[in-house]
Amino acid sequence: MIIAIAVVAGFIMDILFGDPSWIRHPVVIMGKGISIMENALRRMFPKTDRGEFAAGLVMTIVLPVLVLAVTAGVCVAAYMVHPGLCLAVETLWCWQAFSMKGLKTESMNVYRCLAEGELNDSRKAVGRIVGRDTANLDETGVTKAAVETVAENFGDGVMSPLVFMIIGGAPLAMFYKSINTMDSMVGYKNKRFLFFGRAAAKLDDFVNYIPARLGGIMWVAGAMLSGYDYRNSWRIWRRDRRNHASPNSAQTEAACAGALGIRLAGPAYYFGEYYEKPYIGDAINEISYENIRDADRMMYCAGIVAVILAVTVRAAAVMIISAAGA
């Protein structure tokens, strides 16, 4: 019961408050831990391809286990003091595991800049939430980047944390966030991280595999509830969900592109290098900055559906287990 209440309460608090700057976010602490571990492990292991991979593998194993142990220990200790304290801790960490409000806030900053005709400001705004080069993007390019990041990060910021927390509460959600944070910091295929970050990137792909696919289905449901073309969303999801170098990223992007009848992805520049990427979706409609608002609406509807279903499934599972043990 504590986990179900914490999930719902945390989700509502994320919708209402996002990530207030006055509350220290666990991801910030994880990020500092990753930097410290990277520096220490690089000194401990040989400066060879194998040595860097081994160093990264050690961090990939140690950090998530450490995060899980600490957060679970805190929750157990809180429960021993009072179940209400445990609920408060679980709710706080579930709240911080979600990032839906933050995605909406950042994407709407891009929307406002485009609506006001401030292309340079919109490039800077979208540059804060995407990895591609944004300095030379036109209005369509900026809009595509914003829509793609809303859709893709629905997986990392809503669906995956939800799946983990509904199974094992806030500690398992923080376990997931530590893996996702490692990937965002070291999971690059550049000279510095090609070998060191490989284990973290592969683990992130693994833990996101099922949530990403559930996220695509939830996005189709969100499209239906918010009045968009859910039939085309389903069709494009089934057709284009593998059109990405990552096994997970195109799942929600495809559903979003289909719902809006637009074409996303395609070639882009990253760190000054040109990358040929497949397109996602069909260019039925012209891309408009209003699509950013559309994506946010679908994200919220998809998130609400996902939370309701997750809590329902957990409640049913608990009832079945209780009945079997009676």
Give each language-model segment a name:
Residues 1-175, 179, 187-326:
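Hydrophobic alpha-helical transmembrane segments
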